[in-house]
Each structure stands twice: as structure tokens, then as C-alpha cells.
């Protein structure tokens, strides 16, 4: 496990408790392979772990901070970043960007952000089927994330691989909606 990741959602802290007990052998890895050595993400993560403030003024690298006080302006900025600015300025395709929000409700919550991003990145088209679900609309081409474990779903990939179960955090793209 990673001691710097978010804690468990449910009760308990099994991994942390086991490591602190000293009963289970543990090794700490110090070399980072996911980001480049000169990554501002890495530098700022280390700074935060040491109780220091991250560098927020440099917007020319892989870590930057944009202050938005009005919630509507924040949503507009997120849409601009995903639709135009990150793909054009950093070469990151929109389908590789993940937006995190600490809440579901409100102007800046996941429900509203998802609606705004869907309208910008995957608008309705005659060639795309869609399905209303409660107060949401799912559309072919939408990126989706599973929010609860479902062990009973049987799935098949394009390459023929099959399996059962989809799990909290699994991400995919809606390929087809049955008529």
C-alpha cells in the first residue's frame, strides 16, 4: 500500500494498523517511476508531505493552481481545461483527463460537473443512442465510473476476453446502448 493515499472508506485501517504493529515485515519504496524526475507533481507532493506549501505560481509544468472563487466560473474553467486548454497546450487528450470533486451535490459537485463535461465533450448527436436514468442521461461515448461493486455482471471485451464483476472505481466508455 501507499501511506500517502487516501484512507479506507469503510471502518478500520487494516494495512496501516498491520504496518504500525511491527508484526508484518514492511519495505518502503523511495524511487518514483510514474512521473518524470523533474515533475512538479513529485516536488510538490514531497513538499506537502514535509508540511511545506506547494509551488502554486508556475503554470508552465504538470502541476498548477487556478484560483476560482465563483462556483459557476470554476465549472466553466474545468470544462475549458478538459475541452481545449490541456489537449492543446499540454498534449493531453480529453479522454485521458480525470476530474475529481470532493462532493456529489452543488454547483461544483460531480453531478453538475458531469453534466457540463458531457455537454462539452460528448454532446447529443443523431448517431448516438442515449438513455435517461433518473435525472441523468447516459449517451454512447460517455466515460463512466462504477460507484458500487456488482459481482453478478458478466462482461466481454472487444478482444473476446470475458469475466464477471465490475467494481467500485472501474472506468469505461459506453460503446453501445440497446434500443
Language model regions located:
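Conserved helicase motor core of P-loop NTPases
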Residues: 3-164
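Conserved beta-strand and immediately adjacent loop positions that scaffold enzyme active sites
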Residues: 98, 171-173
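Conserved beta-strand residues within beta-sheet cores
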Residues: 143, 168-171
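A generic structural signal for residues embedded in beta-strands
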Residues: 146, 174-177
Amino acid at each position: 500500500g501507499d501511506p500517502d493515499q487516501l484512507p479506507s472508506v469503510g471502518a478500520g485501517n487494516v494495512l496501516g494498523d498491520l504496518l504500525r504493529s511491527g508484526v508484518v515485515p514492511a519495505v518502503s519504496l523511495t524511487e518514483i517511476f510514474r512521473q518524470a524526475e523533474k515533475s512538479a507533481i513529485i516536488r510538490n507532493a514531497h513538499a506537502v508531505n514535509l508540511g511545506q506549501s506547494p509551488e502554486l505560481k508556475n503554470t508552465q509544468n504538470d502541476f498548477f493552481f487556478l484560483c476560482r472563487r465563483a462556483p459557476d466560473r470554476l465549472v466553466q474553467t474545468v470544462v475549458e481545461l478538459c475541452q481545449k486548454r490541456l489537449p492543446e497546450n499540454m498534449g493531453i487528450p480529453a479522454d485521458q483527463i480525470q476530474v475529481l470533486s470532493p462532493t456529489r451535490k452543488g454547483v461544483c459537485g460531480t453531478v453538475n460537473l458531469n453534466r457540463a463535461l458531457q455537454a462539452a465533450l460528448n454532446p447529443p448527436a443523431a448517431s448516438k443512442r442515449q438513455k435517461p436514468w433518473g435525472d441523468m442521461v447516459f449517451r454512447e461515448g460517455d466515460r463512466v465510473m462504477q460507484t458500487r461493486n456488482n459481482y453478478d455482471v458478466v462482461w466481454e471485451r472487444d478482444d473476446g476476453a470475458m469475466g464477471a464483476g465490475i467494481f467500485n472505481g472501474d472506468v469505461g466508455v459506453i460503446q453501445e446502448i440497446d434500443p
